[in-house]
């Protein structure tokens, strides 16, 4: 019985130490998600203001990045995951959304080139021996605009190339949208070719009268410079959304782990108390039994 009590005490110490770790991770994630939320809010106006003049230009300009191919045959999919785990279903939901998008594009006759941000997504694809054109890692917790530019560069290069030279006709992105501390949703969005109606709706300019611009030297030259910045800003915003979602998911997972550890400690404490009481009861029974046997022996010797 004493050995069982020692086992319970050892498990209580182990779970208590784990609870301290998960509580600390919960607090760190809570701090990071607040910072990430602020960055998301700060990056949105930039993407919106960058888009509005593009709307006024692109609506009357034929440009490779705003014109859909007659028969698109190849698409690039950028999947955003995290470098670390301990975030519940955050990564699995994003990967599932990317796989569903890939299946849909392939059914429509497109060859899909996959680009991945985050070690978790890359590990998933490598384990299943799926081809990844290019991957990026090491910055998913706190992405910067420089990271977004690094991710966007090969994608912009691919969309500008002809498909016969290894280019793509479309660019899609899959990331986790931060809705609230309790809700994060995996979504997919087509970045290129730009859909004027979709971008207008996203930017809130659907019913807005757009200003007229006079561009020098030409609208096409402006689009050449403007659209890469647009792609970079959209990817940056998606990286920030994913970072905020990951921290929120980690906070929620660690809170659940902390609560479960507390419940397990209570259960083990009850079992330890029961084992201690049983041990005490057994000792008392042995003492009483020994005293009774001694009394019987003394009575027999007197007779």
Curated annotation (Swiss-Prot):
Q: Could you tell me which Pfam families the record lists for this protein?
A: ATP-synt
* Single GO BP term: proton motive force-driven plasma membrane ATP synthesis
Fetch the PROSITE patterns from UniProt.
Answer: ATPASE_GAMMA (PS00153)
- Record key words, sorted: ATP synthesis, Cell membrane, CF(1), Hydrogen ion transport, Ion transport, Membrane, Transport
The annotated topology with respect to the bilayer is: Peripheral membrane protein
Q: Which GO terms describe its molecular function?
A: ATP binding; proton-transporting ATP synthase activity, rotational mechanism
Identify the GO cellular component terms for this protein.
plasma membrane; proton-transporting ATP synthase complex
Where in or outside the cell it occurs: the entry states:
Cell membrane
Could you give the subunit structure recorded for this chain? F-type ATPases have 2 components, CF(1) - the catalytic core - and CF(0) - the membrane proton channel. CF(1) has five subunits: alpha(3), beta(3), gamma(1), delta(1), epsilon(1). CF(0) has three main subunits: a, b and c.
Do you know which HAMAP family this protein is assigned to? ATP_synth_gamma_bact (MF_00815)
Family per record = Belongs to the ATPase gamma chain family.
NCBIfam families from the UniProt entry: ATPsyn_F1gamma (TIGR01146), PRK05621.1-2 (NF004145)
**Role description:** Produces ATP from ADP in the presence of a proton gradient across the membrane. The gamma chain is believed to be important in regulating ATPase activity and the flow of protons through the CF(0) complex.
Name the chain's protein.
ATP synthase gamma chain
Gene name of the record = atpG
